[in-house]
């Protein structure tokens, strides 16, 4: 099997329509009182780089917009219990969020997220990771349900959650790209 070095893949991305700005697709709809959101992006990175960013629980607030803190409380088997605090904003409205989530890691395919406790009525979903047909090219997606515990008009809720999830997902993709570029730079300098 032909193995193409990661720096070659990263260097060629502009030729294939990929840029340093994340190309994120987002779809949302109201379902059974909750907002269902799907986000997806194609990322040129190693599996390890992607997985390390997704599971860097203590540093998520450094690169996820709207997240003020994220702290790994403990692991129980392959389940990480993570405390997160932040807010979702849309126009003049701000929804404070404080949750403890269970991140159920099914390496290498997915991380399922379930609400353990907090200020949301419902949070269930997760990340899916699939190879995009080439070495070091991946489809990363997040899909799930979110329902605030306070009553908010549906037209505001859907926009609030969709915009917030887009920003958070883009933050994750940008961090993966940043880590990939750091590896590429380090590898390139070690060859000199």
Which role does the model predict for each range below?
Residues 22, 65, 93-97, 119-126, ...:
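Amphipathic hydrophobic-ligand
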Residues 17-77, 192:
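Hydrophobic ligand-binding cavity/cleft-lining segments
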Residues 30, 42, 71-118, 170-179, ...:
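Glycine-rich portal/gate segments that line the openings of hydrophobic small-molecule binding cavities
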Residues 10-17:
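Hydrophobic h-region of N-terminal signal peptides that target proteins for export
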């Amino acid at each position: 099997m032909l193995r193409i070095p990661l720096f070659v893949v990263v260097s060629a991305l502009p030729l294939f329509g990929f840029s340093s700005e994340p190309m994120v697709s987002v779809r949302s709809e109201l379902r059974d009182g909750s907002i269902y959101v799907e986000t997806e992006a194609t990322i040129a990175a190693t599996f390890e780089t992607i997985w390390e960013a997704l599971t860097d629980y203590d540093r998520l607030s450094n690169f996820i917009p709207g997240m003020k803190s994220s702290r790994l409380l403990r692991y129980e088997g392959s389940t990480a219990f993570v405390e997160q605090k932040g807010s979702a904003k849309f126009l003049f409205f701000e929804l404070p969020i404080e949750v403890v989530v269970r991140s159920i890691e099914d390496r290498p395919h997915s991380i399922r997220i379930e609400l353990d406790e907090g200020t949301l009525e419902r949070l269930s979903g997760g990340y899916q990771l699939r190879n995009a047909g080439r070495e070091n090219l991946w489809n990363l997606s997040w899909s799930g349900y979110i329902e605030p515990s306070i009553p908010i008009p549906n037209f505001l809720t859907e926009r609030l959650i969709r915009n917030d999830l887009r920003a958070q997902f883009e933050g994750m993709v940008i961090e993966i790209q940043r880590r990939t570029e750091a590896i590429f730079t380090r590898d390139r300098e070690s060859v000199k």
